[in-house]
Design a protein with these regions (language model features):
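Cysteine-centered catalytic environments shared across enzyme families
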Residues: 1-178
Length: 178
């Protein structure tokens, strides 16, 4: 919250690193901000159902909110998507007027007018690499090692699930060096 007060939403989201789904209500401006991490690790659902704004990290919380009102309608196109892709693509959910916020986006909601504005706050930059193979390997190693080291900072023991693939094996091998 101090970051929002000091820098505003755009600068705050530029500075935050990690997994998150956050909500900030600015009482003075009567604006609600909902934001999701860059990689989309933490989910964030939001809805505008009959003029009621709702949000939660799990869809079942929004279902529970409206269960006695019987106002949630199924979005049948989402079911078709599920049968086609075996998941419901973002931003859809199984309900009309309830959505999953995309990774690296935030939602600015003017509470007075119920106006929703979706803003992408981060873009993945793809840069051409002109390094030779050895330099490129070293850079990749250093970046992955730094990322793993940052995730190893915890106040409880850290465990791993191994799929047997290259990615999980690489992470565990690097973590064992920390």
């Amino acid at each position: 919250l101090y970051g929002y007060i000091e820098w505003g939403i755009d600068k705050l989201l530029e500075k935050i690193d990690g997994m998150y789904a956050i909500s900030i209500y600015d009482k003075e401006k009567e604006e609600l901000f909902l934001a999701r991490d860059r990689a989309g690790i933490k989910p964030l659902y939001y809805g505008n159902v009959n003029g009621q704004i709702s949000w939660a990290s799990e869809l079942k919380a929004i279902q529970k909110l409206y269960e006695n009102q019987n106002i949630l309608e199924y979005d049948y196109t989402a079911f078709y998507d599920f049968l086609t892709y075996l998941y419901i693509p973002t931003p859809k959910s199984m309900y009309k007027n309830v959505y999953k916020l995309e990774p690296a986006y935030y939602l600015k909601i003017d509470v007075r007018s119920n106006n929703f504005e979706k803003i992408q706050y981060w873009h993945l930059e793809v840069k051409k690499c002109n390094d030779d193979i050895e330099t490129a390997k070293k850079k990749i190693y250093d970046l992955v090692k730094k990322s793993v080291d940052e995730q190893m900072v915890a106040d409880v023991p850290v465990g791993f699930f191994l799929s047997g693939g290259m990615d999980s094996s690489t992470v565990v091998a690097l973590a064992s060096q920390s």
